[in-house]
């Protein structure tokens, strides 16, 4: 087997380090021994955008907030379904992730960061959510490993009751909060309901095909 080769590292605000590595044509981002992202598994990240933005294809000036740039799969899927007049804000906590997108991972991103619809906001995605006040038609969260925070302690605030109520307030009427997770989480689904959302839990394939592990996407809608 071809060994993993280290490309770069990124220190996290709460301590710990992300490692960008590759094995042949496959790129991975690791936190400790946990694989957070892989270039070979993009199906569920793409589903986060296609499901979360499903009703926005014909909405003029739709505004979408994406939490987490990752390897760009959610962003590119959102770009594919959103109209030319849309605005897409990507909040990314770790500056090196953006640097990697323009460097060793540029082949995955292609020219998606040059799209005039896209802007990058460095910092915690919770900040634009709290300041949102009915601004967003969709909020797509692929932050950490899902509601069970792994790499950033503050993500507990994002996925807790107060954070979900803030997300509800940041959505326009009829807007959708879409949340990715590696695992099911009954308690989180219940918190979504208590925050006022109508909740639809979907199982999606990590590969995007008919085989492979399932991930979870919650579609939490604000009443229109």
PLM feature spans:
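N-terminal auxiliary segments of SAM/dcSAM-dependent transferases
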Residues: 1-30
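The AdoMet/dcAdoMet-binding core of the Class I SAM-like
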Residues: 2, 42-171, 179-180, 190, ...
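Generic beta-structure capping elements
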Residues: 23, 32, 141-146, 223
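Short, surface-exposed beta-strand-loop junctions and turns on beta-sheet-rich folds
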Residues: 35-37
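Active-site beta-loop-alpha junctions enriched in small/polar residues
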Residues: 182-184
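C-terminal lobe and adjacent flexible extensions of AdoMet/dcAdoMet transferase-like proteins
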Residues: 218-224
């Amino acid at each position: 087997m071809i060994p993993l080769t280290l490309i770069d590292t990124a220190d996290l605000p709460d301590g710990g380090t992300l490692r960008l590595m590759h094995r042949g044509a496959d790129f991975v981002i690791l936190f400790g021994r946990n694989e957070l992202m892989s270039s070979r598994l993009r199906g569920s990240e793409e589903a986060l955008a296609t499901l979360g933005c499903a009703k926005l294809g014909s909405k003029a000036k739709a505004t979408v907030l994406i939490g987490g740039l990752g390897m760009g799969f959610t962003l590119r899927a959102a770009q594919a379904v959103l109209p030319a007049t849309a605005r897409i804000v990507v909040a990314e906590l770790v500056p090196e992730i953006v640097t990697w997108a323009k460097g060793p991972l540029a082949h995955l991103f292609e020219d998606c960061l040059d799209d005039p619809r896209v802007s990058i906001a460095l910092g915690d995605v919770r900040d634009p959510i709290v300041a949102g006040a009915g601004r967003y038609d969709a909020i797509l969260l692929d932050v950490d490993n899902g509601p069970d925070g792994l790499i950033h302690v503050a993500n507990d605030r994002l996925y807790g009751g107060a954070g979900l109520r803030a997300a509800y307030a940041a959505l326009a009427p009829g807007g959708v909060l879409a949340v990715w997770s590696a695992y099911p989480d009954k308690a989180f689904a219940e918190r979504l309901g208590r925050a006022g959302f109508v909740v639809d839990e979907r199982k999606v394939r990590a590969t995007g095909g008919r085989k492979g592990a399932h991930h979870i996407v919650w579609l939490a809608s604000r009443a229109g």
